[in-house]
Each structure stands twice: as structure tokens, then as C-alpha cells.
Amino acid sequence: MKILVLNSGSSSIKFKLFEKDEALASGLVEKIGEQNSKIELKDLKSGQKYKKELAIKDHEQGIELVNELFAQSGILHDLNELDGCGHRIVHGGPNLTKHCLVDDEILKEIDRVAHIAPLHNPAHLIGIKTMIKAAPKVPNVTVFDTAFHQSMPDYAYMYALPYEFYEKHQVRKYGFHGTSHSYVSKQAAYILGKNINEFNAISAHLGNGASVCAIENGKCVDTSMGFTPLEGLIMGTRCGDIDPAVLPFLAKELNLNPSDLDTMMNKKSGVYGICGFNDFRDIEAQIEQNNEKARLALDMFCYRLSKYIGSYFAILPRVDALIFTAGIGENDDIVRAKVCQRLAHLGFDIDLDKNAQLRNGEISKKDSKIKILIVPTEEELEIAKITTELIKNK
């Protein structure tokens, strides 16, 4: 089966084409709505790239150009040849708890919760509708970042706010990066020869956005991100957990409105807010040059991450593995070493040589009580697999 995976942003479309779990091509349409828009497609077998630079007025034109480049490359003659299209959807809200085939009711529900994820859901809807128009016979599937976390118990996802905020406004913890946490937990169970339904793990998805997830018997029981991706860990430009009273204080002191506060917390905080850098390669290079703010930022990041991992020991009856994934998780041996050494008393015994050399696989010592693994995330592949399964079973 040929499955196209789409991730539609407000001004971009990321796409990847799979056949029987093998990636054939990937690409990006960017700067949609601007004069200097561009589209690039890469044939992942030959390595050949196909590019166009022109003004792309909207997502519909972007999808038409994707179709043209596929035909030009010979990888796919027409989008109607696809067996299915899987769409990454950031937020499913309280009602869309499972991945599903698209119909009118699903589109209405994604739109209904768009106010909870205003930066993502409206763009996802445009992507789905554009694809339906471009290839009307191809089934579309929605894969929700929030779905994996729907197994959390109510005492884990509820906030101690007036209950009516939950009833009337759906204010609760939803969690994100679910597709990634689901994929790497299954991969880790396979690597360790465990049945996923009996596998307990803590998964750390560490990129510019970062979250941890407590997994019991293959299901999420808690995660660090909340109502939005702002809660939890210190991130590249996001503050993570803070005392909520800081916000009205700053609003009053600095005459800031809600939009100012939102921008400050999401785009000007995190490690960037502390040291002026959000790329950990730059932060670690600055530490080599004795930049104290860079050292502080790294220490804060690793401390918060260690605290979250440690707290999940309190809610899991047993921990089989700690999984590192995403850009920092897969590539930053300094972060992994600092966290695992801080948590050594809990049963983590990291092999520093393996940690420095490997970017995939087990990095704990043979006699480590808890296994430590690097598992590269493949969110698009997971979306393609889910899409294939739903179409086969429809």
C-alpha cells in the first residue's frame, strides 16, 4: 500500500510517502502565502532532489505542486494512486480519543476544538480538506498527538481548578508527542524482547519541544505536557512549569496583556531565555568557553528532566526501561549522561563509552537494573502504519 503522510502547518506542508513501511520520498512546501515560497521533494532511494521556487498562494496550490513533483520524479504519477493519506493532528480534544478515518463529523470535531490549538488545528483542517479535493477517492486518516495519552486516569489529567472549567471549556491535561511516545515504547519493547502489553517504561522525547511519558503495560498513565505543550519540562524556548502567580505579577509590573505573556512563555523562555541559545550544540559550545548562563541553562534543563523521570517511579509499579528520543534525546550524550548519573540510585547504570558512540540502541551496562535506550523516533512511519491498519479494517 502507498500511504502519504501529511503534516500541514499554518504556512507549510511536510510530507512523506511510504510503501509497505518503506519511505520512498519526503518533502516540504514552505512559506505558503508569500512571494518566495518553495517546494522540495527528495527521492529517498536515488537521493535526487526536485525543487521549485514560486509564489504559492495557498495549501491547495501547494498540494497541486506536490502532485506535479511526484509525477516529474516518476515516484507517483498521480495522488489518486494512493491507498491512503494520514494526517498528523496535534489536538483531538476530549472526544477524539482514537485515530480514525475522516468523515464530516470528524472534521466538525477537529474544528470545534480549534480554539484549544489555534496554531495547529485550523491548518490541519485545511490540509485534510485540500487533500480530499485533490484526490477525492483516497481515504484520509487523522492521527492525533493526544490520542496515546487518553488512557491517563482522571486524577492524572484533571487540574485542581473549578470543575466547571473542565465541563464547559474542556480544560484538562491532554499531553502531546503521543505518536512518538507510542512508537518508541513499542520499539523498545521489541528490542528488549518484551511484550508491549507487559512493558513499563519512561519515554523522554527531547527536541526543541520536550516531554516525558510514564508508560504502564504499554499505555500512557501520565505525561509532562498539559492543556498545551507549554507545561512540564524546560524546553528550547518554552518555560515549562512555573508558579502561575508569576503571570499576573508580570502583567501588572510590566503592563503585559495575555498575548504578550503567551509569546514570552512560548518563544522567549526556556533555555533560550536563560542564555540566549536554544540549540544545545551552541549551549554546550558556550559552556566550553566558560559561559555561566549556558551552564546554568543546561543544568536547569537536566535537573527538571531528572525530577520528572524520578517522579514517575512513584506511580509506576516497575520500570523496565528509560527511552531517549528526538533531536536532543538521540544526539546529546552530555544530557543523557548528566540525567542518568543523577538518577543512578534508582537503578540506572549508563555505559559512558556506548553513550558517547551510539545514536541508536542500548547504552546501559549489562548489569544495569533498568535498561537505558536510544530509540530514534519515526513519527511519520507510525502515522503510515496507523493509516494502513485503519484502511485495511474499515
Curated annotation (Swiss-Prot):
Which reaction equation describes what this protein catalyses?
acetate + ATP = acetyl phosphate + ADP
Q: Give me the comment on cofactor binding.
A: Mg(2+). Can also accept Mn(2+).
What cofactor is this protein dependent on? Mg(2+); Mn(2+)
User: What main location does UniProt list?
Assistant: cytoplasm
| Gene3D superfamilies named in the record | 3.30.420.40
Chain positions recorded as Mg(2+) binding sites: N7, E379
Q: Which GO terms describe its biological process?
A: acetate metabolic process; acetyl-CoA biosynthetic process
List, from the UniProt record, the residues annotated as the active site of this protein: D145 (proton donor/acceptor)
Nucleotide-binding as UniProt keyword: yes
One of its Pfam families is: Acetate_kinase
User: What compartments host this protein?
Assistant: Cytoplasm
Asked if the Swiss-Prot or TrEMBL record annotates the protein with the keyword Kinase, the reply is yes
Tell me the subunit arrangement. Answer: Homodimer.
- What is known about what this protein does? Catalyzes the formation of acetyl phosphate from acetate and ATP. Can also catalyze the reverse reaction.
Q: Which HAMAP family match?
A: Acetate_kinase
Query: What is the name of this protein?
Result: Acetate kinase
Encoding gene (name): ackA
